[in-house]
Amino acid sequence: MILMAFAVYAIQGCHSASTANTADSTATKDTTKAAAAGTAAVDSSDVKFADNAAGGGMAEIELSKLAQQKSTNTKIKNFAAMMVTDHSKAGDTLAVIAKNKNITLPTALDADHQKKLDDLSKKSGADFDKAYVKIMVEDHNGALKLMQDEAANGKDADLKAFAGKVAPTVQMHIDAINKIKAGM
């Protein structure tokens, strides 16, 4: 873009004012077209990643809010609080990336995650804690694979970098929930 701007200014120096205005107008149109093409060029696999990551993160938040209310285990409540904080931060970052790329992220839980939330909400005590831990282990293992796959194979640089940055946090969550599981 800098070279394009320089070229437009160089052309302006060589031509009359009306020709320069035409060059400016053409350069602006070309730049706008390039920017629009850049947002439309996000690969479908990257869009699917963003959708899955956002949906999974949203589910972790909702499940963990429920755990903060219903669990009787302090370690689980602390883990759930960490989930809400970490997944909210990651979700906010992903939302900015998605907005810049015109990717529409889900605003509600998908059917699978909604069923998990509904089923979990019916449990209490030790049954609740065991079910929550089981879901966290399964979902985080899936999330780690999702992040690692995108970090290794993603085509969009921003989403690839996001996945690479989030993967170690997901691994830390796996380690923490497995430690809680081992102590139950």
Q: Which positions does each model-derived feature cover?
A:
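His/Met- and acidic-residue-enriched segments that coordinate or traffic transition-metal cofactors
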Residues: M1-M184
